[in-house]
Amino acid sequence: MAVSLWQQCIARLQDELSAQQFSMWIRPLQAEMEGDTLVIYAPNRFVLDWVRDKYLNIINQFFTEQMGSDAPSLRFDIGSRPSAKPVVQATAAVRTSRPVTREVTKPSFNTPHAEPMANANHRSNINPTYQFDNFVEGKSNQLGKAAALQVAENPGGAYNPLFLYGGTGLGKTHLLHAVGNGIIKNNPNAKVVYMHSERFVQDMVKALQNNAIEEFKRYYRSVDALFIDDIQFFANKDRSQEEFFHTFNALLEGNHQIILTSDKYPKEIDGVEDRLKSRFGWGLTVAIEPPELETRVAILMRKAQESGINLPDEVAFFIAKRLRSNVRELEGALNRVIANANFTGRPITIDFVREALRDLLALQEKLVTIDNIQKTVAEYYKIKMADMLSKRRSRSVARPRQMAMALSKELTNQSLPEIGDAFGGRDHTTVLHACRKIAQLREESHDIKEDYANLIRTLSS
């Protein structure tokens, strides 16, 4: 009975969670009774810890409602349920066994990455420096890293396609290469190809010019994993979209892994055919958001450590509080600080950083103000600027106001009382409540999460 109720529990979770949350955390679970205990199996430690932390109370509550004092105790484990292991292993064998490497004749469209090479990394254009171990994880990219790890462990079987989207310099490309390195580590013969979407277009043009389109098709449809960066550049390139459509279908039919990245959610990409946008969402779509303060600090500390520099904590926080848009900007700023310190021989202090980054910091202070945030949010939600300062409490006004307060805390250096004062003289506790509410809604609502990411991108661009 408990096992059948588990299926009902799954159905309830599907109703309560977003499609992405359900696909990511609940769908991979299996369950089986062992005596009076319902054992829930997760595919790996990351999923197990996440489900136990986030959803255990919901699961316990469901069984208590249905069975009262007869509700089974719950236990979590890693793996698959024992009675199902033969089936699971057989499925896994089909999905995870990598196809024997096929010799592919060098196509006459003659692109560098198409040449058969002894070195798998060179052949694949996978950068060996991008690993999961040196990817700094935070709330902004946690789901993306978790999904990428599972794809690396089970290419073609975990999430296919995996679609990562977010602004420039947030780590999407790092994750692509990390997955590629993971696949090649597990199977050195795997044919993993990474490229920018423009390269795919260029290859197709060359193939058409050289009357070699069949070789082009054979090459791209023979790879074990295809990773394409910035898929939005396919916009309005009809012939390229047509060819990629058929390549996409062929790879998926063969359980070959596809990972795509974009600066926008699939359905928001202009100039791309609906049938492609639909397919982009067949697997798992994950947003990579701008890093929060703690992650920005961790990125700076990691980068400094790699450069052999002792970066004081207060300096890392000073930089992280002022440069918020993306990882690339942070690393560039730190490189400038390090170069200046090496050149002048001066210690790295807050005053030194102010001097070394004065133009960059001045630009940031000029661009992002509370007034600018209020105007941007009001325009985004189509409310009046006066509503930001009013006492109106209707959700259509209160939610944008809370969003603007949360963004003001994230993107400016103003204190909570100063932010409250800028919103019609509100108390700092009102601002704190708004920040916590938006943080909660970003976890629960895909729409709010999207709004927040879109506004961050707009204000940071």
From Swiss-Prot:
Family matches, as PROSITE patterns: DNAA
UniProt GO BP: DNA replication initiation; regulation of DNA replication
Residues covered by region (Domain II): 87-124
Chain intervals for the UniProt region annotation (Domain III, AAA+ region): 125-341
Any matching Pfam family: Hda_lid
Region of interest: Domain IV, binds dsDNA: 342-461
Chain segments annotated as transmembrane: none
Region (Disordered): 99-125
InterPro entries: AAA+_ATPase (IPR003593), Chromosome_initiator_DnaA (IPR001957), Chromosome_initiator_DnaA-like (IPR020591), Chromosome_initiator_DnaA_CS (IPR018312), DnaA_C (IPR013159), DnaA_dom (IPR013317), DnaA_N_dom (IPR024633), DnaA_N_sf (IPR038454)
Residue numbers spanned by region Domain I, interacts with DnaA modulators: 1-87
Stored Gene3D superfamilies: 1.10.1750.10, 1.10.8.60, 3.30.300.180, P-loop containing nucleotide triphosphate hydrolases
MF GO annotations: ATP binding; ATP hydrolysis activity; DNA replication origin binding; lipid binding
UniProt KW keywords: ATP-binding, Cytoplasm, DNA replication, DNA-binding, Lipid-binding, Nucleotide-binding
Keyword Transmembrane helix included in the entry's annotation: no
Location in the cell: Cytoplasm
Task of the protein: Plays an essential role in the initiation and regulation of chromosomal replication. ATP-DnaA binds to the origin of replication (oriC) to initiate formation of the DNA replication initiation complex once per cell cycle. Binds the DnaA box (a 9 base pair repeat at the origin) and separates the double-stranded (ds)DNA. Forms a right-handed helical filament on oriC DNA; dsDNA binds to the exterior of the filament while single-stranded (ss)DNA is stabiized in the filament's interior.
Homology family: Belongs to the DnaA family.
Record remark: domains: Domain I is involved in oligomerization and binding regulators, domain II is flexibile and of varying length in different bacteria, domain III forms the AAA+ region, while domain IV binds dsDNA.
Subunit text: Oligomerizes as a right-handed, spiral filament on DNA at oriC.
The name this protein goes by in its record: Chromosomal replication initiator protein DnaA
Species for this entry: Shewanella pealeana (strain ATCC 700345 / ANG-SQ1)
Classification lineage: Bacteria, Pseudomonadati, Pseudomonadota, Gammaproteobacteria, Alteromonadales
Gene name of the encoded protein: dnaA
